[in-house]
């Protein structure tokens, strides 16, 4: 997690320096590539990954404007070296040797845009990028941010299968923003410090497929069923809330970048052998009848070390689980069909 530390100098005029760090300890060489680094999510994500001391090489790729982002971020005096790559001809260089690839590429959601609209654009982008990943860094961990994640992760899996390079332990749909929102909203209603809150979120990463398990939230609070229902609904509609608040001028870019950086840090910790790194993610799974499902996973040197059981669910959550399955199943099938057409 991020930690902010305010350092004040008493010898000179009062000055404050905010130092942000993620993890400490052993720091092996790790290359992280961000595909879509010049976009609304990509730029703040690049900044946050530049602040992560676990990253030794930060590779920024996009179809345009990447050199400027790389130059800007590259002036920050942290460990990683930054290189920007632009255009199809440089994608291979951006990917070669990557330990972790984060994909926020694609168009953001706008008011009035349907999921089909989003799918029709972003599915093709993801397909092309994953084809390159399979060729140039087939053993990297993949963090999929590009929406609709419920479909783009199955697309990626199919592309890797075709290339003979699929490792289900290394493909992740980033659902961390759902967890971040659930924690924030729960803390507000439970009147507890948000830093102490944890809420597992299962299912998928869109609308009703997002199912926060407030019955498993810590610390526990005695909230009414009406409040829990409202919290669930707000978590599911969090993306729409931001899109509407920005009035057509963007989607959840900053909070998504923060969530993406949190999950990437967890993946790097796992790669480096830190024990008991557990996060929620949308992965290949057998805990339900669906081939992909978001739940708590234990991260390690090979990516997913273990997909954890769902644990006890309330009656409301059991109903939500059954209700989300048809839509999630349809989204998965849509992705598989696209990848194979």
Curated annotation (Swiss-Prot):
Active-site residues per Swiss-Prot or TrEMBL entry: 205
UniProt-annotated binding residues for NAD(+): 36-42, 62, 122, 145-147, 256
Keyword flag Oxidoreductase: yes
Catalytic activity as recorded in UniProt: (S)-malate + NAD(+) = oxaloacetate + NADH + H(+)
Presequence range in chain numbering: 1-22
One cellular-component annotation, GO: nucleus
Domain of life: Eukaryota
Post-translational modification: Forms intramolecular disulfide bonds.
GO BP terms, alphabetized: malate metabolic process; response to cold; tricarboxylic acid cycle
The enzyme's E.C. designation: 1.1.1.37
Keyword Aminoacyl-tRNA synthetase: no
Activity regulation annotation text: Negatively regulated by ATP. Not redox-regulated. The formation of intramolecular disulfide bonds does not alter enzymatic activity.
Enzyme class: oxidoreductase
Record note on disruption phenotype: Slight reduction of rosette leaf size and reduction by 50 percents in fresh weight and seed production. The double mutant plants mmdh1 and mmdh2 have decreased germination rate, grow slowly, are small, have increased photorespiration and die before producing seeds.
Keyword terms: Disulfide bond, Mitochondrion, NAD, Oxidoreductase, Transit peptide, Tricarboxylic acid cycle
Pfam families referenced in this protein's UniProt entry, alphabetically: Ldh_1_C, Ldh_1_N
Subcellular location: Mitochondrion matrix
Major place of residence: mitochondrion
Gene Ontology MF annotations: copper ion binding; L-malate dehydrogenase (NAD+) activity
Family from the record: Belongs to the LDH/MDH superfamily. MDH type 1 family.
Subunit (UniProt): Homodimer.
General function of this protein: Catalyzes a reversible NAD-dependent dehydrogenase reaction involved in central metabolism and redox homeostasis between organelle compartments. Required for carbon dioxide and energy partitioning in leaves. May limit photorespiration during the dark phase. Its activity is essential to shuttle reductants out from the mitochondria to support the photorespiratory flux. Can convert 2-oxoglutarate to (S)-2-hydroxyglutarate in vitro.
Protein name as catalogued: Malate dehydrogenase 1, mitochondrial
